[in-house]
């Protein structure tokens, strides 16, 4: 695993408290405050060694997400119901904003399909909330569409620990982002950068290195005027505007990124034949509910009985797509599998071959 890559299903181990037994652990400390309660992360009034805190870099971000939202200026004076109403009304603006960038998302989808068909990969690079959304999207694709593990790789600034708590200064590590990209990106891959502001150094470092390696690049952000738009293959700038809580991009900006990622990865799977009609036909049945869903999918797609669907699945050793092609075409399971192999795993293509 590369430094920032997050493997699905592998949360970091709890961190031992320094003054505790080796085997004990403690809940995550709120970002910015040490576990011993002595003050700020830089020492401050609670510093025990008397040294002045080290100076840290300060950046004033110029982004629409950093502006104050006129609809929430009295947020702290509102009732709980009114706070929720303001948030909900602002959230309703996000889907309309995503609608305006559908053409750009479509171009990114075609780039991903081309890369995956050529045996290449799709990488997500992000920091903070944006990076966590990339991890979430990549992790959901295998159980939903039975994608090979290597197809989608998520890289999070600060590594796996950053899924659960903020890793200080990780997003500012432009060199780290570039080095991580150089360690895993190949020519022909697609690299998708996720950054609410459009200027996160870790993400821009990865995108720049990926371009140098011969990979196509996409940037998804909440600033349509981001300077980085000029340096990527596809720029997806969703105009979400100021947040209800100023600068809290875990709100509308993150919602927009989630909607874009939902559409992007789902459309890629549709183009690659992982969906028939609007049914998941490559899903992995990892529990009783999903095994029941496989039966329902066959019944819905073929209008057969549950008993026939169960028998077809048994004959196909649980291979839903092979069972589906067999039922729709009337062919034996072995012939259905052969037709799928010859049609790039596309159900409609396999049925056409068997009909011919």
Task: Give names to the regions the model predicted.
Residues 122-272:
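Glycine-rich phosphate-binding loops that contact phosphosugars or nucleotide phosphates
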Residues 86-94, 154-165, 276, 317:
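Gly-rich Lys/Arg/Thr-decorated short loops/hinges at beta-loop-alpha junctions or inter-strand turns
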Residues 2-5, 44-97, 101:
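Cofactor-/ligand-binding subdomain signature composed of acidic, glycine-rich
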Residues 100-117:
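A short, well-structured juxtamembrane/interface segment
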Residues 103, 107, 201, 255, ...:
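Charged, alpha-helix-enriched surfaces in structured cytosolic catalytic cores
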Residues 263, 268-356:
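Short, amphipathic alpha-helical interaction segments embedded in low-complexity terminal/linker regions
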Residues 4-54:
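Intrinsically disordered, low-complexity terminal tails and inter-domain linkers enriched
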């Amino acid at each position: 695993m590369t430094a920032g890559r997050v493997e699905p299903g592998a949360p970091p181990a709890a961190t031992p408290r320094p003054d505790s037994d080796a085997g004990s652990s403690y809940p995550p400390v709120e970002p910015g405050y040490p576990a011993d309660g002595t003050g700020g992360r830089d020492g401050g009034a609670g510093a025990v060694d008397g040294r002045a805190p080290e100076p840290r870099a300060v950046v004033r971000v110029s982004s629409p997400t950093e502006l104050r939202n006129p609809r929430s200026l009295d947020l702290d004076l509102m009732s709980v119901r009114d706070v929720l109403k303001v948030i909900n009304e602002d959230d309703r603006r996000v889907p309309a904003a995503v609608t305006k960038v559908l053409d750009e998302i479509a171009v990114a989808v075609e780039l991903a399909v081309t890369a995956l068909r050529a045996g290449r990969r799709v990488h997500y690079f992000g920091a903070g909330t944006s990076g966590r959304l990339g991890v979430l999207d990549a992790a959901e694709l295998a159980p939903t569409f039975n994608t090979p593990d290597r197809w989608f790789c998520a890289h999070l600034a600060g590594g796996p620990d950053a899924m659960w708590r903020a890793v200080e200064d990780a997003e500012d590590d432009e060199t780290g982002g570039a080095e991580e990209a150089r360690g895993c990106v190949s020519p022909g891959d697609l690299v998708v950068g996720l950054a609410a502001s459009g200027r996160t150094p870790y993400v821009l470092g990865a995108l720049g290195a990926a371009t140098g390696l011969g990979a196509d690049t996409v940037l998804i952000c909440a600033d349509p005027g981001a300077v980085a738009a000029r340096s990527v293959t596809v720029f997806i700038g969703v105009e979400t505007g100021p947040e209800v809580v100023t600068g809290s991009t875990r709100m509308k900006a993150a919602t927009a990124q989630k909607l874009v990622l939902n559409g992007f990865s789902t459309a890629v799977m549709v183009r690659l034949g992982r969906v028939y009609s609007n049914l998941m036909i490559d899903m992995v049945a990892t529990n009783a509910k999903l095994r029941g869903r496989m039966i329902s999918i066959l019944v819905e797609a073929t209008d057969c009985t549950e008993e026939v669907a169960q028998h077809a699945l048994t004959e196909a050793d649980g291979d839903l797509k092979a069972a589906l092609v067999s039922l729709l075409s009337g062919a034996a399971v072995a012939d259905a599998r052969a037709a799928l192999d010859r049609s790039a795993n596309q159900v409609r293509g396999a049925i056409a071959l068997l009909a011919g």
